[in-house]
């Protein structure tokens, strides 16, 4: 088996969409914005990305109901390519684990 794991923390930056497939599987899709400072070759650099995320299954329904724009999260799962309506491929993080980050309020 080939490794395909990604853990990314960030803030939800687009309103989540929730749908149920014809087979009854709930899906929640949103975009996670990540910003951090990383060290590469001994130098610091700004790291930034926006990653589309999809989380599926009834086991995750409760946590996805609390996700809104601005919610800080850590998401773990695998990445896969999805083809959009415009014919372009984009990387999507298929979440298998999701954690709300306590903002300390």
Curated annotation (Swiss-Prot):
UniProt xrefs under SUPFAM superfamilies: Nucleic acid-binding proteins
Molecular functions per Gene Ontology: single-stranded DNA binding
PROSITE patterns the record matches: SSB (PS50935)
Recorded superkingdom: Bacteria
Alphabetized Gene3D superfamilies for the sequence: Nucleic acid-binding proteins
Pfam families to which the protein is assigned, alphabetical: SSB_1 (PF22657)
Protein keywords: DNA replication, DNA-binding, Primosome
Record InterPro entries: NA-bd_OB-fold, Primosome_PriB/ssb, Prisomal_replication_PriB
Oligomeric and partner information: Homodimer. Interacts with PriA and DnaT. Component of the replication restart primosome. Primosome assembly occurs via a 'hand-off' mechanism. PriA binds to replication forks, subsequently PriB then DnaT bind; DnaT then displaces ssDNA to generate the helicase loading substrate.
Similarity comment text for this entry: Belongs to the PriB family.
Record protein name field: Replication restart protein PriB
Lineage of source species: Bacteria, Pseudomonadati, Pseudomonadota, Gammaproteobacteria, Enterobacterales
């Amino acid at each position: 088996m080939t490794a395909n794991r990604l853990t990314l923390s960030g803030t939800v930056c687009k309103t989540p969409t929730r749908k149920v497939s014809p087979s009854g599987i709930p899906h929640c899709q949103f975009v996670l914005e990540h910003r951090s400072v990383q060290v590469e070759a001994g130098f610091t650099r700004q790291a930034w990305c926006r990653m589309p995320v999809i989380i599926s299954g009834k086991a995750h329904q409760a946590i996805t109901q609390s996700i809104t724009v601005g919610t800080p999260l850590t998401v773990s799962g695998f990445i896969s390519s999805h083809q959009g309506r415009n014919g372009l491929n984009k990387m999507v993080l298929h979440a298998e684990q999701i954690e709300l980050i306590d903002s300390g309020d």
